[in-house]
Amino acid sequence: MPIWSGILVGVVALLAGVALGFFIARKYMMNYLQKNPPINEQMLKMMMMQMGQKPSQKKINQMMSAMNKQMK
C-alpha cells in the first residue's frame, strides 16, 4: 500500500470519527435536556411557593441572576 493511500485512509477515518462523535454528543445532550430541562422563572416561583415563601418578582430575579452567575 503506497504511503499516500495510508494517509488518506487515516484522514477519512479521523473525519468520520469526528462526525460520528458530534452526532452522538448532540443526541445525548438533546435527550439530557429533554429529561432535565433548565430551570426557569415559573419553576422557581413554584419552588418558592412550595417552601412557603411568597415569591416576589425581585426575589425571583435575584435568584435567577445568582444561578446564571454560578453557571458561568
UniProtKB/Swiss-Prot annotation:
Keywords assigned by UniProt, alphabetized: Cell membrane, Membrane, Transmembrane, Transmembrane helix
Subcellular location: Cell membrane
Main location class: membrane
GO CC, any one term: plasma membrane
UniProt entry tagged with the keyword Transcription regulation: no
Domain of life according to the entry: Bacteria
Keyword field contains Lipid biosynthesis: no
Membrane disposition: Single-pass membrane protein
TM spans (from-to): 3-23
UniProt xrefs under Pfam families: UPF0154 (PF03672)
Family in the record: Belongs to the UPF0154 family.
Name of the protein in question: UPF0154 protein Bcer98_2334
